[in-house]
Amino acid sequence: MREYEAVIGLEVHVELKTNTKIFCNCSTEFGGDPNSHVCPVCLGLPGVLPVLNKKVVDYAIKAALALNCEVAEYCKFDRKNYYYPDLPKNYQISQYDLPLAKNGYLEIEVDGQVKRIGITRIHMEEDAGKLVHQGNLAVTPYSLVDYNRTGVPLIEIVSAPDIRTPEEARLYLEKLKAIIQYTGISDCRMEEGSLRCDANVSVRPKGQKEFGTKTEIKNMNSFKALQKALEYEIARQIEILEEGGRIIQETRMWDESRQVTLSMRSKEEAHDYRYFPEPDLPPVVIDREWLEEIRATLPELPDARKKRFVEQYGLTPYDAHVLTLTRELADYYEEAAKGYSNPKAVANWVINELLRLLNAAGKEITECPIKPEQITKMLELLDKGTISGKIAKTVFEEMFSSGKDPEVIVKEKGLVQITDLGELEAVVDKVIAANPKAVEDYKNGKEKALGFLVGQIMKETRGRANPEAVNQLLRDKLAKL
């Protein structure tokens, strides 16, 4: 069998977080009643004219700068003509030969190596409506159309065909999502459709420079789905070529339930859309002053923030990576770390405990019931010896479920650590007397028996005993027996 490699390019649609649509004043709010956010403009009724929302251009420029693109001084809109039930005008206002930006890139890390993925272009366009099907698409008796999404502003980010594996595709999309979220121009919620990804994929024998025949894959609504769909499609294409077959250029749909791609329609070429300049919109001229005004609003982006976390807080690259996955998480960590002397300890609690609790509860960091300063207060109780490490986890979980301050929880539940040697000595004596076999085992060289006895003491004190003091006291007493 010949060795093949995949050639993958991604087309990512990002819904911009503006209050109104790209060419009219209708709301962009998600989740309204079907066809409640519509007007004659977004429904394409006769006699209406589009008016460009300047905020859309601002946000598109911001994305282009964050992705290292060259922003055009002059760009225009075009009509993309096609017929589909979710497109009321029978054309989409998009950009064709003069897009807003081109020649950008982002970098991903693959097996410890940095790889640069080119971005061919970024252009602005309006979204289409949404078809709602009853049950399975293959057997549904009818489809309904919700036009609320029609005219919602999008940018389409087109990668160069630099991606070679499904894993690289997933890493690219994860990085792109993080960068866009950091800029604040979109919430990038894949489950709500505000970040959508189509993949173009072909395979070729290793060493061959010419591209193979590509297919386009749609309907991938998660990072995992993207990777799985590409893995399946690459294997499907290789199998066809190995059997002497020919790849058909077509659009395919990822079927999540069956974990396969299914043919939808033949793939269109650009000339099929009969692009021509949009006659109802003037070209957009972007001068240097406008560009620099937007550049000044760019936040610290994920890579720069990750590097600073390593240098400023002494974090490992991995911990810095986890904490900078979203802007909100990075902000939360910094707020907690600034009030405490040991930023590494804060990172450990946020990554190992807080994220675990958030995941279990299905919550985002923005919904976190623990305030950043409460983590600092709890760590200070730990440093003072007021609570033990084990009790700290109990307190932390209670903070998460109740939102109360750690001092209040410790007082209410009587969780102050026992450090009084007299009190500890009485418990140690009681446990030694109650467990003669474990004592004998320890004296015979079985070190595990000591752990058992420590566990019994912690159980007796409900975890409030100071572990170091218990260990030392127990060893001293056992040595005298």
Swiss-Prot record:
Keywords: ATP-binding, Ligase, Nucleotide-binding, Protein biosynthesis. Transmembrane segments: none annotated. It catalyses: L-glutamyl-tRNA(Gln) + L-glutamine + ATP + H2O = L-glutaminyl-tRNA(Gln) + L-glutamate + ADP + phosphate + H(+); L-aspartyl-tRNA(Asn) + L-glutamine + ATP + H2O = L-asparaginyl-tRNA(Asn) + L-glutamate + ADP + phosphate + 2 H(+). One of its GO terms (biological process) is translation. The gene is gatB. Its EC number is 6.3.5.-. One of its GO terms (molecular function) is glutaminyl-tRNA synthase (glutamine-hydrolyzing) activity. Allows the formation of correctly charged Asn-tRNA(Asn) or Gln-tRNA(Gln) through the transamidation of misacylated Asp-tRNA(Asn) or Glu-tRNA(Gln) in organisms which lack either or both of asparaginyl-tRNA or glutaminyl-tRNA synthetases. The reaction takes place in the presence of glutamine and ATP through an activated phospho-Asp-tRNA(Asn) or phospho-Glu-tRNA(Gln). InterPro entries: Asn/Gln-tRNA_amidoTrfase_suB/E, Asn/Gln-tRNA_Trfase_suB/E_cat, Asn/Gln_amidotransferase, Asn/Gln_tRNA_amidoTrase-B-like, GatB, GatB_C_1, GatB_Yqey_C_2, Gln-tRNA_amidoTrfase_suB_CS. It comes from Carboxydothermus hydrogenoformans (strain ATCC BAA-161 / DSM 6008 / Z-2901). Pfam families: GatB_N, GatB_Yqey. This is Aspartyl/glutamyl-tRNA(Asn/Gln) amidotransferase subunit B. Belongs to the GatB/GatE family. GatB subfamily. Heterotrimer of A, B and C subunits.
